[in-house]
From Swiss-Prot:
Pathway assignment: Amino-acid biosynthesis; L-isoleucine biosynthesis; L-isoleucine from 2-oxobutanoate: step 3/4; Amino-acid biosynthesis; L-valine biosynthesis; L-valine from pyruvate: step 3/4
Assembly and interaction partners: Homodimer.
Enzyme kind, highest EC tier: lyase
Cofactor: [2Fe-2S] cluster; Mg(2+)
UniProt: [2Fe-2S] cluster binding residues: 122, 198
Pfam short name (any one): ILV_EDD_C
Gene name of the encoded protein: ilvD1
Keywords noted in UniProt: 2Fe-2S, Amino-acid biosynthesis, Branched-chain amino acid biosynthesis, Iron, Iron-sulfur, Lyase, Magnesium, Metal-binding
Keyword rRNA-binding: no
The protein, known as: Dihydroxy-acid dehydratase 1
Family: Belongs to the IlvD/Edd family.
């Protein structure tokens, strides 16, 4: 029978000093036999996805204590990728994932907490906490702050919504010289109306949906908007549930409730199956690979490639379409609705466990609105946006008049009526990416699935932006942005500005972009990232020259630099001859801090999730 971890610091005469300090935090005599549960919050006023979380930790804590536990809250950092975008701040985004994972480990292990409720939301916070949960392997429930409502532009005549907007629309309009200042300002003011994670199928929402599929979050976690009153129930339930999980593990020796028991290889495969089916952000590939490594699960790019070849695209939301946002996915039945369709297509392992419903199959039976779910589920998925700008959680209770249960032409489709039988994400291989690269096929126009173009080579994102805005990129080009990988950046910047500017220049469907960096979940078009190995690790992307021919073939999962092997060998030899300057960007001016240098020293390429390789410390 496992012992409560907290007894290490709460029991025995030798812990009198520790108990004295615990008492100073408010604990009483009767609390020292209860489980101590860490409420891992991530409130910050810097990030709209986290600005409303200040009081939600206390909400969870009250439920924990009412259920017989002791709640102790702390905060992690949280970087807003949208605010950090387009300048040196983006270098810090991906490395913050490791910092978050480490800080959770430090706090939980230093204070011997028995379990956690992880209150996450935005891009690197959910992955960082997920990595920590796998690492610590103590009972945990994830509950996110929830998605932002989509922005709306309404008709001045009848007030009806004539367009839905998000952050990416604001960026594209601002860069389009044909858009007036007044129109650009209207979009800017309308794009992000409420608290919550940005409203499309971007990285934050993708990851919060995937925690449902993995089994560590409650139904609706990824889709019910942050402002809706019914989201409060997820936080309350999480507080009660984590105490139950604690008792099952520590008092009943039930290890099935532990993260590593739930997040098995089959669970990661289920999550990736969902990811491909819903066209999730390409960043999810990095984060699932990283979390799997922390869990000790052998889940690799080859598994992702295999899954991507057999799973159809069953759901589309912005940026893959301007018709639907996350609030529309919720109205169509949320993640359990997509999982229900995948289950009926025999594409899931329904025996995988979760924290709330026994097995995935049981959860689908209870929550899939097209699979016979009851009145409670039917009501829950009618939770709608309120249409009122606010930074306050649970501030409205609007409901949709009807559910979207149309699986032929609706937001969520069944397999027979899939958006495409080829899934929403794909892994490409070739001499430009021997270890793979990632493309979000859900966001690529079918006319570009096979594309050949001329290389336009840039040594940094900044140079690429200057080149695109300076009209140095033309239709038919393949923009190469290199030395932006985990080591080369360092930090593997997102390329939302280059992709947005290509669209603003009318090149979104006539150009491609290939990089060892990564993309915001808001990027779409023929944009291919995560080139592995990266340029700084000797990847062939570092040998591409201006004007080279690049061949892209998504149906056959191929990306190829049309240069002979002899020529490539000569280029590689010439690069090696540069000595210490080999595999380094030419004439790039970039200040790299000591913190980022430390990250770069241990970072791996994207095919391994850009995690740290601690074996390098032994060299």
């Amino acid at each position: 029978m496992p012992h409560y971890r907290s007894r290490t610091s709460t029991h025995g005469r030798n812990m009198a000093g520790a108990r004295a300090l615990w008492r100073a935090t408010g604990m009483k005599d009767g609390d020292f036999g209860k489980p101590i549960i860490a409420v891992v919050n991530s409130f910050t006023q810097f990030v709209p996805g986290h600005v409303h979380l200040r009081d939600l930790g206390a909400l969870v804590a009250r439920e924990i204590e009412a259920a017989g536990g002791v709640a102790k809250e702390f905060n992690t950092i949280a970087v807003d990728d949208g605010i950090a975008m387009g300048h040196g701040g983006m270098l810090y985004s991906l490395p913050s994932r490791e910092l978050i994972a480490d800080s959770v480990e430090y706090m939980v292990n230093a204070h011997c907490a028995d379990a956690m409720v992880c209150i996450s939301n935005c891009d690197k916070i959910t992955p960082g906490m997920l990595m920590a949960a796998m690492r610590l392997n103590i009972p945990v429930v994830f509950v996110s702050g929830g998605p932002m409502e989509a922005g709306k532009i309404t008709s001045p005549v009848d007030g009806k919504v004539i367009a839905k907007l998000d952050l990416v629309d604001a960026m594209i309009k601002a860069a389009d010289p044909n858009v007036s200042d007044a129109e650009a300002e209207e979009v800017e003011r309308s794009a992000c109306p409420t608290c919550g994670s940005c409203s499309g199928m971007f990285t934050a929402n993708s990851m919060n949906c995937l925690t449902e599929a993995i089994g560590l979050a409650l139904p609706g976690n990824g889709t019910i908007v942050a402002t809706h009153a019914w989201r409060k129930g997820l936080f309350e339930q999480a507080g009660r549930l984590v105490v139950e999980l604690c008792r099952r593990y520590y008092e009943q020796d039930d290890a099935s409730v532990l993260p590593r028991s739930i997040a098995t290889k089959s669970a990661f495969e289920n999550a990736m199956t969902l990811d491909v089916a819903m066209g999730g952000s390409t960043n999810t590939v990095l984060h699932l690979l990283a979390a799997a490594q922390e869990a000790g699960v052998d889940f690799t790019m080859s598994d992702i490639d295999r899954i991507s070849r057999r799973v159809p695209c069953l759901c589309k939301a912005a940026p893959a379409t301007d018709k639907y946002h996350i609030e529309d996915v919720h109205r169509a039945g949320g993640i359990l609705g997509i999982l229900g369709e995948l289950g009926r297509a025999d594409l899931l392992d329904l025996s995988c466990g979760n924290v709330h419903s026994g097995t995935l199959g049981e959860a689908i039976n209870q929550w899939d609105i097209n699979g016979g779910a009851g009145e409670a589920a039917q009501k829950f998925f009618r939770a709608a946006p309120g249409g009122i700008p606010t930074t306050v959680a649970f501030s409205q209770d609007a409901t949709f008049l009807t559910l979207d249960m149309d699986r032929q032409t609706g937001c969520i489709r069944d397999k027979a009526h899939a958006y495409s039988q080829d899934g929403g994400l794909a892994v490409l291989y070739g001499n430009l990416a021997e270890k793979g690269c990632i493309v979000k096929t859900a966001g690529v126009d079918e006319s570009q699935w096979v594309f050949t173009g001329r290389a336009r080579v840039f040594e940094s994102q900044e140079d690429a932006v200057e080149g695109i805005l300076g009209d140095r990129v033309q239709a038919g080009d393949v923009v190469i942005i290199r030395y932006e990988g985990p080591k080369g950046g360092p930090g593997m910047q997102e390329m939302l500005y280059p992709t947005s500017y290509l669209k603003s220049k009318g090149l979104g469907k006539t150009c491609a972009l290939f990089t060892d960096g990564r993309f915001s979940g808001g990027s779409s078009g023929l944009v291919i990232g995560h080139a592995s190995p990266e340029a700084a690790e000797g990847g062939t992307i570092g040998l591409v020259e201006e004007g080279d021919t690049i061949e892209i073939d998504i149906p056959n999962r191929r990306i190829h630099l049309a240069v002979g092997d002899t020529v490539l060998a000569e280029r590689r030899a010439a690069m090696q001859a540069r000595g210490e300057q080999a595999w380094q960007p030419v004439d790039r001016e970039r200040v790299v801090s000591q913190a980022l240098r430390a990250y770069a020293a241990l970072a791996t390429s994207a095919d391994r999730g850009a995690v740290r390789d601690l074996s390098q410390l032994k060299r």
